[in-house]
Swiss-Prot record:
<keyword id="KW-0067">ATP-binding</keyword>
<dbReference type="InterPro" id="IPR007696">
    <property type="entry name" value="DNA_mismatch_repair_MutS_core"/>
</dbReference>
<feature type="modified residue" description="Phosphothreonine">
    <location>
        <position position="1099"/>
    </location>
</feature>
<comment type="function">
    <text>Component of the post-replicative DNA mismatch repair system (MMR). Heterodimerizes with MSH2 to form MutS beta which binds to DNA mismatches thereby initiating DNA repair. When bound, the MutS beta heterodimer bends the DNA helix and shields approximately 20 base pairs. MutS beta recognizes large insertion-deletion loops (IDL) up to 13 nucleotides long. After mismatch binding, forms a ternary complex with the MutL alpha heterodimer, which is thought to be responsible for directing the downstream MMR events, including strand discrimination, excision, and resynthesis.</text>
</comment>
<dbReference type="InterPro" id="IPR007860">
    <property type="entry name" value="DNA_mmatch_repair_MutS_con_dom"/>
</dbReference>
<feature type="binding site">
    <location>
        <begin position="896"/>
        <end position="903"/>
    </location>
    <ligand>
        <name>ATP</name>
    </ligand>
</feature>
<dbReference type="GO" id="GO:0006281">
    <property type="term" value="P:DNA repair"/>
</dbReference>
<feature type="compositionally biased region" description="Polar residues">
    <location>
        <begin position="201"/>
        <end position="220"/>
    </location>
</feature>
<keyword id="KW-0227">DNA damage</keyword>
<dbReference type="Pfam" id="PF05192">
    <property type="entry name" value="MutS_III"/>
</dbReference>
<dbReference type="GO" id="GO:0032302">
    <property type="term" value="C:MutSbeta complex"/>
</dbReference>
<dbReference type="InterPro" id="IPR036678">
    <property type="entry name" value="MutS_con_dom_sf"/>
</dbReference>
<feature type="region of interest" description="Disordered">
    <location>
        <begin position="31"/>
        <end position="122"/>
    </location>
</feature>
<dbReference type="GO" id="GO:0005654">
    <property type="term" value="C:nucleoplasm"/>
</dbReference>
<dbReference type="GO" id="GO:0005634">
    <property type="term" value="C:nucleus"/>
</dbReference>
<dbReference type="GO" id="GO:0016020">
    <property type="term" value="C:membrane"/>
</dbReference>
<dbReference type="InterPro" id="IPR045076">
    <property type="entry name" value="MutS"/>
</dbReference>
Length: 1137
């Protein structure tokens, strides 16, 4: 390579070029990793003496320059630490890079000493990479290679700082290069308005004239008129412009590559290697690891696109674009809710080398929830009240739910639905009301990174009713061919406006993923909240009662679902979760479930054992069927699902006689007997498939009988014809070679080669093509084989394309039975849930509840279902009775010492009620449960920073919500209402609220309090209200008081955890302080002060009691007696004090 010529355009530029070259060479030598392979002599030693003298003269004439900073610069400690950390980053796919380095080193030969003339010595790989990177650095100012927000504002130096996160050369060299660029960057900002790229020869010049800079810039601009991007980079830029919000994985041969910011994201999140290649940072992963890495990126909240090659080498060779780049297109997009497809299928792709927990989160539900607001009522909007519509879809299972409701400023209704669905992704307009935005922020901020809800925003225009109505009608009108289709459209347009807006937005969103087909059957839509079918359990109650997850670490263990979940299948687990969050209201349906659980529990028939064994072996066929419905499944997955369904059909068909004779439950008989008939279509599709081809994914041999696939048959006949011609050509080859035993050989996939010993190569015709050789033999193709083998490969690749098209048609035909097969899976899930509840009932001391229409909750020796399991058999839970009914007491006021078990008791009552209405046995000796339409709770004391609410505000907001929604058929639980404010205000609010529920709402109520005045409501409503407390014992030894002592010893309380009639006069809070290891001195002082205050209060109460008697006296004798008693009481009080 010849030395760079001095730039023209003036003496200064001409004379300074060698000096700049010397500076640049010293820069390369200053970095520890940039040493020439030839010798230690730098470029400065090779500078022409005459040019050097001219440069020295020019430098003498110039004004003195400021002292140069130390070079290389000293790195700050935090940068040095970061560099060390990056050097130690484990590399997953550095094999291709190492091979490339080795290949280049071998090509260079290791010595450059033989060079002569003006040719520059060869530099090592690292030197050439840095030189090349500095050249590309100047071209990297292209807007498409950087985030749009940084294109106009960042300097060249700042842009360079983005690049070297992980490259072929070390970070110290890049930091030095960054410093070398800084001076030229400042000149560029002064002398150019646009993004001008400079020649490397300008780095080191400190006195280049403005005229020379302009000429250099003009020359550089002309140079850039040609494309600076590789064809692959241009292809990537075009695809990235269409999918700016997605991380793109681009198929390139045997690997998938990331470019630009996508590569940096992949390197950071996947812990893989990335480096600078041409104009972009790049990283790559092997094709067989795509499943793992896509799932990891999706779990982090990214939208991931997979770009695949749509051409093959053989077909491309005969096309018009044979010299151009392989065509590619986006074949799949994935987010948390749309993780469906052959590339990411966990059913097939998992192997022993993959850690399932590392790449998969809880897949029990994966809802995409779209929220829309009706903003027509301005007055309600100012108050925070608004009408909301939602549509939730679960693409993995095909489930679609919708709802519309009026919500208050607290957004409790929306929070309830979000808590029930637990969406993994939200689809929202670009702007929502302030209160809704606050709820969304709170919901997306409380979870950890991998479990965080992903938020996707769309422009508000897609949520406008006029646009949404048109989009929805167009979507459903294309399938309207009969009266039924017209009825479907009529049902859709009659939905509430916000629901239609949400539906239109979700249709548009799912079209991007090719998943909109699941919305084409609106008769399968289900309304989320139906007050006529299910008990109302809002989000606060789900959280307070720990129904789905505990409040300690937000995990399933320690929740009611954890106690009840003994399911064997994934789809059974999802159905049980619905049962738990939606207890039934219809007595007939509740008793049907209880009858089924009771029969499984007590039956001695072996049929239930057989069914349970069948369920234990099942994969997640619900998700598999949905993947088939969307035509995103592999042949392996399809065969596994269809074969599983076929075996289920056969097994359930075999037990039909036993079911008819041994099973009495109507629910079990119905679902079990319907399963074989619903699964009958799968046998036909299974017989068509070739098992071995399906298991290995070979679509060309997938179908046994090709009579239904004429295109595949035609293509295979053409292929066989070419093969026959090639085989017949062997006779001619034998004649040419005069070798009757000559045969074709296949080596490394290369077919139809003629193998000749190297000693006999002279007899080979000159027009034969040599394909390969070894030390002993050479292999050839004749011209006839070359032509026909090329044609054969083209036909084979065309066959693959034809088979793929026929495969999609085959899946389309199978999808006609999707809904009947899904119904069978739902029946299997129901059986699985019944078996799970039966296993719960076998745990011991569980009873079948008596469920009735009357308003009552009567429980004998009931236990908290979760605490009972957590304690185990060694530490048994203390059982308690409950008796609430419309005819007697329907309100329990519960007092007692702190930590006495009050909260556990009221939760126990609520959970037993929920279990009974699910259709489960309950932990009690006896239980009679009247159907309640909702359970409302106000428990705990904590502020809400996200809502900007104090503890007391949070209490009153929840209480106001209960007051609005509770009915006489509800169960209301209020735990220590009023403790977030002063004593007087707290007592007043607690008293007034409880009286309202007693007098007006008339619901079954459990009210926990530490305020004795609230207990006086029993006197006013003696038939409806009863006072209770949690039993305890006070130790006499430690509670004895020394009247003359200045310090008192706090009481020692033993908890009995037994509900007892009556009022607890004290709460014994100091006992809790003692258990918490509060220092003894503080406890004694607190005990003394407590007794003192208690005495003052008792004195006031006694005086009020005496003065109340005074107004009832009518003669002097009674007055005299009253005076004596009063004086005696006052004397005793003064002695005590």
């Amino acid at each position: 390579m010849s030395r760079r010529k001095p730039a023209s355009g003036g003496l200064a530029a001409s004379s300074s070029a060698p000096a700049r070259q010397a500076v640049l060479s010293r820069f390369f030598q200053s970095t520890g990793s940039l040493k020439s392979t030839s010798s230690s002599t730098g470029a400065a030693d090779q500078v022409d003496p005459g040019a050097a003298a001219a440069a020295a003269a020019a430098a003498a004439a110039a004004p003195p320059a400021p002292p140069a900073p130390a070079f290389p610069p000293q790195l700050p400690p935090h940068i040095a630490t970061e560099i060390d950390r990056r050097k130690k980053r484990p590399l997953e796919n550095d094999g291709p890079v190492k091979k490339k380095v080795k290949k280049v080193q071998q090509k260079e030969g290791g010595s450059d000493l033989g060079m002569s003339g003006n040719s520059e010595p060869k530099k090592c790989l690292r030197t050439r990479n840095v030189s090349k990177s500095l050249e590309k650095l100047k071209e990297f100012c292209c807007d498409s290679a950087l985030p749009q927000s940084r294109v106009q504002t960042e300097s060249l130096q700042e842009r360079f700082a983005v690049l070297p996160k992980c490259t072929d050369f070390d970070d110290i060299s890049l930091l030095h290069a960054k410093n070398a660029v800084s001076s030229e960057d400042s000149k560029r900002q002064i002398n150019q308005k646009d993004t001008t790229l400079f020649d490397l020869s300008q780095f080191g010049s400190s006195n280049t004239s403005h005229e020379n800079l302009q000429k250099t810039a003009s020359k550089s601009a002309n140079k850039r008129s040609k494309s600076i991007y590789t064809p692959l980079e241009l292809q990537y830029i075009e695809m990235k412009q269409q999918h700016k919000d997605a991380v793109l994985c681009v198929e390139c041969g045997y690997k998938y590559r990331f470019f630009g910011e996508d590569a940096e994201i992949a390197a950071r999140e996947l812990n893989i290697y990335c480096h600078l290649d041409h104009n972009f940072m790049t990283a790559s992963i092997p094709t067989h690891r795509l499943f793992v890495h896509v799932r990891r990126l999706v779990a982090k909240g990214y939208k991931v696109g997979v770009v695949k090659q749509t051409e093959t080498a053989a077909l491309k060779a005969i096309g018009d674009n044979r010299s151009s780049l392989f065509s590619r297109k986006l074949t799949a997009l994935y987010t948390k809710s749309t993780l469906i497809g052959e590339d990411v299928n966990p059913l097939i792709k998992l192997d022993d080398a993959v850690n399932v927990d590392e790449i998969m989160t809880d897949t029990s539900t994966s809802y995409l929830l779209c929220i829309s607001e009706n903003k027509e009522n301005v007055r309600d909007k100012k108050k925070g009240n608004i009408f909301i519509g939602i549509v939730g879809v679960q693409p993995a299972t095909g489930e679609v739910v919708f709802d519309s409701f009026q919500d208050s400023a607290s957004r409790s209704e929306l929070e309830t639905r979000m808590s029930s669905l637990q969406p993994v992704e939200l689809l929202l307009p670009s702007a929502l009301s302030e209160q809704t935005e606050a709820l969304i922020h709170r919901a997306t901020s409380v979870s950890v990174q991998d479990d965080r809800i992903r938020v996707e925003r769309m422009d508000n225009i897609y949520f406008e009713y006029s646009h949404a109505f048109q989009a929805v009608t167009e979507f459903y009108a294309k399938d309207t061919v009969d009266i039924k289709g017209s009825q479907i459209i009529s049902g859709i347009v009659n939905l509430e406006k916000p629901v239609i807006c949400s539906l239109a937005a979700i249709i548009k969103y799912l079209k991007e993923f090719n998943l909109e087909k699941m919305l084409s059957k609106p008769e399968n839509f289900k309304q989320l909240s139906s007050k006529m079918e299910f008990m109302t359990i809002n989000g606060t109650t789900l959280r307070n009662l720990e129904i789905l997850q505990n409040q300690t670490d937000m995990k399933t263990k320690g929740s009611l679902l954890w106690v009840l979940d003994h399911t064997k299948t994934s789809f059974g687990r999802r159905k049980l979760k619905k049962w738990v969050t939606q207890p039934l209201l219809k007595l007939r349906e509740i008793n049907a479930r209880l009858d089924a659980v009771s029969e499984v529990l007590h039956s001695e028939s072996s049929v239930f054992g057989q069914i349970e064994n069948h369920l234990r072996k099942l994969p997640d066929i619900e998700r598999g069927l949905c993947s088939i419905y969307h035509k995103k499944c592999s042949t392996q997955e399809f065969f596994l699902i269809v074969k599983t369904l076929y075996h289920l059909k056969s097994e359930f068909q075999a037990i039909i006689p036993a079911v008819n004779s041994h099973i009495q439950s109507d629910l079990l008989r119905t679902v079990i007997l319907e399963i074989p008939e619903l699964l009958s279509p799968v046998e036909h599709y299974l017989k068509i498939l070739n098992e071995q081809a399906a298991k290995v994914g070979d679509k060309t041999e997938l179908f046994k009988d090709l009579s239904d696939f004429p295109l595949i048959k035609k293509r295979k006949d053409e292929i066989q014809g070419v093969i026959d011609e090639i085989r017949m050509h062997l006779q001619e080859i034998r004649k040419i070679l005069k070798n009757p035993s000559a045969q074709y050989v296949t080596v490394s996939g290369q077919e139809f080669m003629i193998e000749i010993k190297n000693s006999a190569v002279s007899c080979i015709p000159t027009d034969w093509v040599k394909v390969g050789s070894t030390k002993a033999v050479s292999r050839f193709h004749s011209p006839f084989i070359v032509e026909n083998y090329r044609h054969l490969n083209q036909l084979r690749e065309q066959l693959v394309l034809d088979c793929s098209a026929e495969w999609l048609d085959f899946l389309e035909k199978f999808s006609e039975h999707y809904h009947s097969l899904c119904k069978a899976v739902h029946h299997l899930a129901t059986v699985d849930c019944i078996f799970s509840l039966a296993k719960v009932a076998k745990q011991g001391d569980y009873c079948r509840p008596t469920v009735q229409e009357e308003r009552k909750i009567v429980i004998k020796n009931g236990r908290h279902p979760v605490i009972d399991v957590l304690l185990g058999e060694q530490d048994q839970y203390v059982p308690n009775n409950t008796d609430l009914s419309e005819d007697s007491e329907r309100v329990m006021i519960i007092t007692g010492p702190n930590m006495g078990g009050k909260s556990s008791y009221i939760k126990q009552v609520a959970l037993i009620t929920i279990m009974a209405q699910i259709g489960s046995y309950v932990p009690a000796e006896e239980a009679t449960i009247g159907i309640v339409d909702g359970i409302f709770t106000r428990m705990g004391a904590a502020d809400n920073i996200y809502k900007g609410q104090s503890t007391f505000m949070e209490e009153l907001t929840d209480t106001a919500e209960i007051i609005r929604k509770a009915t006489s058929q509800s169960l209301v639980i209020l735990d220590e209402l009023g403790r977030g404010t002063s004593t007087h205000d707290g007592i007043a609010i607690a008293y007034a609220t409880l009286e309202y529920f007693i007098r007006d709402v008339k619901s079954l109520t459990l009210f926990v309090t530490h305020y004795p005045p609230v207990c006086e409501l029993e006197k006013n409503y003696s038939h409806q209200v009863g006072n209770y407390h949690m039993g305890f014992l006070v130790s006499e030894d430690e509670s004895k008081l020394d009247p003359g002592a200045a310090e008192q010893v706090p009481d020692f309380v033993t908890f009995l955890y037994q509900i007892t009639r009556g009022i607890a006069a004290r709460s014994y809070g100091l006992n809790v302080a003692k258990l918490a290891d509060v220092p003894g001195e503080i406890l004694k002082k607190a005990a003394h002060k407590s007794k003192e205050l208690e005495g003052l209060i008792n004195t006031k109460r006694k005086r009020l009691k005496y003065f109340a008697k005074l107004w009832t006296m009518h003669n002097a004798q009674d007055l005299q007696k009253w005076t004596e008693e009063f004086n005696m009481e006052e004397t005793q009080t003064s002695l005590l004090h």
